[in-house]
Amino acid sequence: MEEPGMPHESAEDLFHFNVGGWHFSVPRSKLAQFPDSLLWKEASALTSSENQRLFIDRDGSTFRHVHYYLYTSKLSFSSCAELNLLYEQALGLQLMPLLQTLDNLKEGKHHLRVRPADIPVAERASLNYWRTWKCISKPSEFPIKSPAFTGLHDKAPLGLMDTPLLDTEEEVHYCFLPLDLVAKHPSLVTEDNLLWLAETMALIECECSEFRFIVNFLRSQKILLPDNFSNIDVLEAEVEILEIPELSEAVRLYRMNMGGCSRTSCPPPSPGKGGRSAGLESVKPLYMMALGLLVKYPDSALGQLRIESTLDGSRLYITGNGVLFQHVKNWLGTCRLPLTETVSEVYELCAFLDKRDITYEPMKVALKTHLEPRTLAPMDVLNEEWTAEITVYSSQQIIKVYVGSHWYATTLQTLLKYPELLSNPQRVYWITYGQTLLIYGDGQMFRHILNFLRLGKLFLPTEFKEWPLLCQEVEEYHIPSLSEALVQCEAYKSWIQEKESENEEAFPIRRLHVVTEGPGSLVEFSRDTKETMACVPMEFQDCNDRTMWNKAKGTLARSSQIEEAEQYSQTIQMSLCRGAKRAGNPSTYSHCPGLCANPRHWGGHPESPPKKKCTTVNLTQKPETKDPPVTPMQKLISLVREWDMVNCKQWEFQSLPAPRNSSLEEATLQHSSGSEAVSQPSTSASWKGHSTASEKDPGPQAGAGAGTKDKGPEPNFNPYFPMKRAVALKDWGKQRSKERENPAFELTLPEASEGDNTGVILKVTHPPVVGSDGSCMFFEDSIIYTTHMDHLRRTPPPASPQPREVTFLSFSLSWEEMFYAQKCHCFLTDIILDSIRQNDPKAITAKVVSLVNQLWTLHISPKQFVVDLLAITGFKDDRHTQERLYSWVELTLPFARKYGRCVDLLIQRGLSKSVSYSVLSKYLQDG
C-alpha cells in the first residue's frame, strides 16, 4: 500500500532512468529541487511526446543511494561501503548538494540515516516486477510508493515466471552457462532447471547463490571463496547433487584446510547418489533440450510455432510468435532455439518427434510444414513481400551483458575502451551480435571490472573479501591497465601484506600475475538493444571537470524513421542507442575471432558458410581448404566457390581517398602479380575454356596469370563520393573531433545516354554491414551489378552531416542471404570483367553484358540465362554444369537483387564512405 504522506505522481510527472540495467523513476517535483544537476537538465529537455527512458552508463547499484538522496536529501546507511563510487557519480551528475553531504560525512559533520530495509526492498520490488510484468516487452513502470524504493534490477533476467518453470514466490537464482561448458559437464543442465537455450549459452535455475563458485571452479579448476566463507555446507550440498568428481574432491580438500574436519574424520567423496548426472554420460542433443523446454509452456504462451533453417538445411531452429518468444527476444535479441547442428541430426529429430505424445503435436506440425516441398517464389513478386531497410548503429549502442548470475547494461563505447575484453575468445560470446553479450566469468566480480571500464579506475567496497577470485578474474580478462590498477590498489596491497604476515599454508596467497600485453588485434562488433521505450544514452565526459553530457535525441533507426533518428538536434552530444563492428577483407566477409560465433557451430561444419578471420583491417586472406561437399547446397557452392575471387584478388580496386582541394583521378582495376595469381585460379578455369582472343596460348584452360601479354584494356572505375565520408570503425575512438569538417568531393554519375542501359558495376565501401539475424560476421565492401542509376543520380547530397559515430549498419537480410547475394554479384560482375580482361571480341563481351542485363531485369529466366551463357564460344557446355549452374543462379539471384536494393538505399542515404563505378557500355564501343 502507498505510505501516508507520499504524494501520488502520475506517469506524466515521472522521469525514467536506466542506470546500467537498473530502472529508476523520479518525480519531476523531486528532481526539480536539483536544477543544476545533469539529471534535471537532460530530463527536463525532453518533450512530452518523447516517451523515453534516459540511459546512464554507470553503476546501478550505487545509483540506488543517489535515488534515495533525491527523495529524502539524506544518505542511507548502506552507502558507507561505497562512498568513493558514490562520490564519483555525484560528481559526474553535478549533484552539488550530495557532494557537499559526502564532504561533510568525511569531516564527521553528517550522520548516516539507518535504513535496514535498504537492499531487501530493492529485491522485493524486482521480484514483484517479474511476476507482475512477465512475458511483456515494455519496460516496467513500477509505482513509487515509498522513498525506500531503490530501483528495479531483474533478478531473473528473462522473467520466465509462467508455470511451471518458475512458479515460486521465492527469489530465483539463475546462471548463464556457455554451451561448451554444458558439453563438458552435462549434469549442469536438467529438464527441471533449464530456463532457455541459445546457440552460445544455456540459462539455468540454480538452487543457491553459491552456485557461482561451482561455475568458477569448472572454468579455472580452483576453489576461490571469500575470506571467512560461512556457507560451505550449502555449497557442499549443491556439489553433491552435481556429482562432478574433481569438484567434489576440491571442496572436500578445502573443508579440510579450513579445519572443518581432518583427513581422518572427513568422509571420502561418496559414489553416485542418484544426482543430476545419473544416467547422463553425454550431453543431450539440442533438440531434446529445446523441445523439452517448450512442452512445459501452454500453447497460448508459445503461439504459432515455426521451424527455420540455414539455406543448406543442416541447422534447424524453432521459434514462435507467442508472448514467451516476444519476451525472450526483448531480453536476448533472439528467440530462436537451436535444434540441430548437422544434417544427420535432422533425421534424428524426425525420429524423436515420431515417438512423442500429443504434447509435442505443435512441434510435429511445425516440422512437417517446414519439410514440405516448396517452390521458389517468382522473382517479380519479391518487391511486394520485402522492403529494403537499413538500421544504423552508433558507439552509444546499449548492450546487455550477461555474466554468470548477473546482468548489466553498458554502451559499446565503454566496451571499446579496452579492446582486449572483446578480443578474448575464451571469455566472450555474442548471444546477439552487438546487442546481448555473454561473458564467461563471475557476475559479482564483473561489476567491479565494468566500473573500471567505465571510469578507468578500480572502485572496490570498503569490506571487500573476495581477493583471490578478483585476482583470478583480472588475470583471465587480459587487460593490462586493469591488472596494473589492481596492483596499485592500496586495499589489495594491504591484503597481500596481511596474508604474507599470517604465513598460513591453509590459505595459499593468490598473487596477481600482471598482464603486460594483450591480443594484438582490435576486434569490434555490433547491434543494439531495442526497448519499446527507447533508451537515450547519456554519456559522462571526464568526471573531474564536471562537463555536461552530450546528446543526440532520436528514435530507433528503422525504415522511415531512420532519417529523423540520425539527425543531431542539439550540441549536447548524446547519440542513438546503437553499436559497433569491426573491419574486414574487401569483397569478402569478415569475422571477429573467438567472440562472434559459437565455436561449436562454426568451426567444423562444412555445410556452414566458411569462416574467415580478420586480425587487421586490410588483411589479405587465402582461400581455405574445404572438406568435400556433403549437402546439395555445398555442391552448388563448389561449382562457383572461386568465382568471387576475381573482384577481390585478380581485380583490385585502387584506394579512393578524398583529399581536399585536389583533383580526383580515375581509379582503375589492377591485375594481380603473377605469383599471387597462381594461388588464385582463374574463375574461368572451372567453367570456361580459353578465350577466343587467346587461342594461341597452349593450355586448354587459361590460368589467372595466363594471357597477360595479350590482356585487353583494364576496366576503369571512376570515383564517386555522394556524401561526407563516414568515420571508419577503427578510427572513431581516435579522431572524433577531427572529422567534423572534410566533406568529400562529388562526381555526377553518368547520364542515361552514357550508361545506355547496359548496367554499371559499383564498388561501394561502407561501414561494416551485418545481417538482421544478429550474426557476428560482416562486409565492409560491396561490388554489385546494377541498372538502377537514375534514382542515385537524382539523390541530392545530405543537407546535414551524418552522425560521426556510425560504427556499423544492418541490412534487412540475414547473414546467410547476404553471403550468397555477394557470391551472385561477384559471379555476374566476374564473367563481364573476365571477358574484358581476356580481350574477347567485342561481340562476345556484348553478348555477356546483354545476358547479365536481361537476367537482372528479369527479361529472361535463370535457366535461359545459363543456356545462352554456356552456348557462347569458349564456355564449357555440358548438361551437368548447366543444371548445377541453373540451380545456383535461381537460388542466389533473389538475394542478390535484394542486396543490391539495400546498397542503393545505403548510397541514397549517404552512408557510404566512397563509391566507384565502371560503365560497361564504353567497353563495347568500336575503336
UniProtKB/Swiss-Prot annotation:
Q: Polar residues bias located where?
A: 662-692
Q: Which cellular compartments is it found in? A: Nucleus
Alphabetically ordered keywords of this record: Activator, Differentiation, Meiosis, Nucleus, Phosphoprotein, Repeat, Spermatogenesis, Transcription, Transcription regulation
**Predominant localisation class:** nucleus
- Sequence positions bearing Phosphoserine: S270
Residues of the region (Disordered) are: 603-631, 662-718
According to the entry, every stretch annotated as the BTB domain falls at: 18-72, 399-486
Q: Which GO terms describe its biological process?
A: cell differentiation; male meiotic nuclear division; protein homooligomerization; spermatogenesis
- Which SUPFAM superfamilies is this protein grouped with? POZ domain
Question: Gene Ontology cellular component?
Answer: nucleus
Q: Give the superkingdom in one word.
A: Eukaryota
Q: Subunit details for this protein?
A: Identified in a complex with ZNF541, HDAC1 and HSPA2. Identified in a complex with ZNF541 and HDAC1. Identified in a complex with HDAC1, HDAC2, DNTTIP1 and ZNF541.
Described by its record, this protein's role is as follows: Transcription regulator which is essential for male fertility and for the completion of meiotic prophase in spermatocytes. Regulates progression of the pachytene stage of meiotic prophase and promotes the transcriptional activation activity ZNF541. Required for the organization of chromosomes during metaphase I.
Q: List the PANTHER family.
A: BTB_POZ DOMAIN-CONTAINING PROTEIN KCTD19, POTASSIUM CHANNEL TETRAMERIZATION DOMAIN-CONTAINING
UniProt protein name: BTB/POZ domain-containing protein KCTD19
